[in-house]
Amino acid sequence: MAVGSIASGAVPLVIQDLIAGFGNVLTPFNLFLFFIGITLGMMSGAIPGLNGTMTVVLMAPITYAMAPDSGIMMLAVIYAAAVYAGSISAILFKVPGAPEAIMTTLDGYPMNQNGQLREAISTAVFASAFGGIVGTLILIFFSPVLAEFAIQLSDPEFFAVILLGLALVSTIGAGNITKATMMMCFGLFLGVFGVDPLTGVPRFTFDSNYLASGIDFITVILGVFAFSEVLKQIQSGGNLIGGGGGEGGGSDFSDATSGSMFSPFSYLKRFGRILGVNSVMGTIIGVLPGAGATTGALFGYTFGQRLVPKSVREKFGTGVPEGVAAPETANNAAASGAFVPLLTLGIPGSATTAVILAAFILHGIRPGSSLIEQQGPLVYTIFAALLMANVAILLLNKPVVRLFLQVRHIPRELLLSLIVIFTVVGAFATRNIMADLWTMFLFGVAAYYLEKYNYSVAPMVIGLVLGPLAEPSLRRSLTKAGGDWMVFFQRPVSAVMITLAVLTFFIPLIMDSTQFGDRIREQFGLTELEQ
């Protein structure tokens, strides 16, 4: 098969190679592996405590007995399906099935409680598929261009992007920037426990072997979202699954579109701006090595708030479909974008693509600038499989919605018991350390009381996830610059990002609390958007 060069703009050859990739995926054995990947990915994403990275790690050695295109294709499909499926448990139980779905809990679970379960899941399905498809198309046609962009970036830029993400955390704190910032800083502090990533020196371990390995963010996620919600449900005596989510339940929009694969225009009309902007933005975030789909979801949620009228923006966090569509579009696009540095530079864009890189090496293949030319059939098989996986997610909209709607028929006591079981098993299975169970219980109880006093736990978890990504880039940048902080302002991209981070943090305070903000909105015609 002739392999076209995307960089040369040979679009017809790219399409020809992509068609050949589809043909390869549709062979009986590869098609079987494709459906295995979809099933494993959705299960690992939807079950609390499991995640796509863990499943890819477990399946990677098995691929050694397969042809490279078959095995690596299956791993890519598992990743794509798991990123989407993480939203299912986030919506049903307020338990993110993957770190990428943390932001989805903010509106997905309240929609469930408001009787809009069908609408929430259906919105997540469509937004995930749309973001994944657009991200994969950008990957196919523009990966060399994006790789050139990524290779120009270094530690100052990576730190600046994550700093901007941390600044955006202040917008998700239930309207209280001070409390959100406090929780985010606490999460950053939790991220420094363990061994120093650059020097190997123990920090805040208190001579404890357990703390030397750091605080696992999966354990914290299970505690603050799952176990705390169980405590809340026991105390309130309410229903974990909101009423009205069944047939005939939900809003008019739900009745018109949820559970149907024949109404994409309804979604495009309502979420068009969010889908378009967040697909591109999520892909670009995914291209940055180390940023990953979790960062993409954070950017997507906050961008989504700025792409809707003020009347909708003020309801973010209380259960609006836009709050589900925004992060789901971005995180699935970012998952596709993470393949750009992997395939073109040999640099993983996320934890899961790092495992997929290991699978490449296991098969004697080293990703890099010449991979598309030397391993064209393999690369285009992966491209085709990613497209098919996201289309499959869209086509599975109706059966997936109907399947998960059945959860509301499970007795409340049994459902809470199952969540506790999955939470305990998930906390232990992550690292096989019994002390993680006590950590999970501790954070669960703490989150229960924090939320009673209106402290949002999401900023804390985001701080814990992003902190360990930001610290090495910050310290390497300062080491190379001899401790000169101006290194972040001498590079255009990092200077712009840090400036945006400062503005992102302070402008909402000015715009929302002063007459000056009202005059600015009137001067630039922003009052129309806010109606």
Go through each PLM region and give its residues.
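Helix-loop-helix hairpins and the membrane-proximal interhelical loops
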Residues: A2-D69, P144, E148-I151, F204-V320, ...
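Short helix-coil transition sites and intra-membrane helix breaks within transmembrane domains
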Residues: S44-M54, I91-I102, V134-I138, I285-T294, ...
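Re-entrant/interfacial helical elements at transmembrane boundaries that shape
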Residues: G52-I62, L75, A90-P110, I140-F141, ...
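Flexible loop linkers connecting adjacent transmembrane helices
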Residues: L58, L92-A120, V145, S154, ...
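Membrane-interface alpha-helices at helix entry/exit sites of multi-pass transporters
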Residues: D69-M73, P110-A127, K310-G323, A351-A354, ...
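A structural-propensity feature for long, helix-poor, extended segments
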Residues: Y79-I91, G97-A98, G319-L345, G349, ...
